[in-house]
Structure formats: C-alpha cells, structure tokens
Amino acid sequence: MGILKIEGVTHWSIGVNNLEESEAFYGDLLGLTPMGRLGNSVMSCFNVGDHNILLCEREQPVEIGPEADHRVHHSFTVSPETFVQACKEFDARQIPIADLIYRGQGFFTGRELYFFDPSGNRLELRDPTWSQGMPEPAFEEIVAS
C-alpha cells in the first residue's frame, strides 16, 4: 500500500502536432466523445467510458518515427466487430500500421492492432474476446474479409 491514496485518474494527456487534425482523428475516426477545448484553445478534451483524454498541441511539432520506443502507447478496448471495421477503415485511409499481435497469455490477452495517429503517437486497439486457439488471420486477411 502506498503512502498516498489516489482516488482516480482525472485525465491522460497525449501530445499532438496539429490539434484540429488530431481532433478529427480521435473524434471522427476513433469515435471518442469530444468534450470541448479548454480555455487556452491548445488543449482539447475527449471522453471514452470513465476516462478523459486531453489532446495537447505541442508548441513545436515533434517527429516521432516508427523506430521510437514501441512500449510507450495508449490502448483502447474494442469489440470484435469494431476491430475488423478498424482494420478495414485504417487500410482504406492508409493509417500507418505497426503490428498485429495475437496475445494468448499475459495480463492483457486478446488480439492487438498497433497503429499511429497523425502525430506519430503509437496507439493500440485491443479485442479482449480473442483467445489462444482461435484463428490468427493476418491484417490483410482481415481487411479482405
């Protein structure tokens, strides 16, 4: 048990290079609920479930390439249907895909699609209903289905 008792998370922040482009990506494509911009207009709040995500426009754009630390990412839980829909939509929109992983063991099991937002932040869509022994189609096979 820690010294302090944290009662919850107010929000998570994601640094972005272009706030308007990122608002469209997270709101229109990923379907997060827009809550509005903060008073300073360089931060925009989105909600999903019990979580608030704050998009923070960087003062200077940062180039984040696929070679960046792949362990740092934000993960979103989706249904199997949304997972397939996302694969097809990302392919059609040429959203950069990093990896498709089928994780049968560990703390977070399921199938995981890693991709990048317009600012180069690594994101994950996770379908927790997939389990070891189920089919493991490649990304291209899911897109073609």
Task: Show which residues each predicted segment covers.
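Vicinal oxygen chelate
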Residues: 1-5, 8-17, 47, 64-89, 92-145, ...
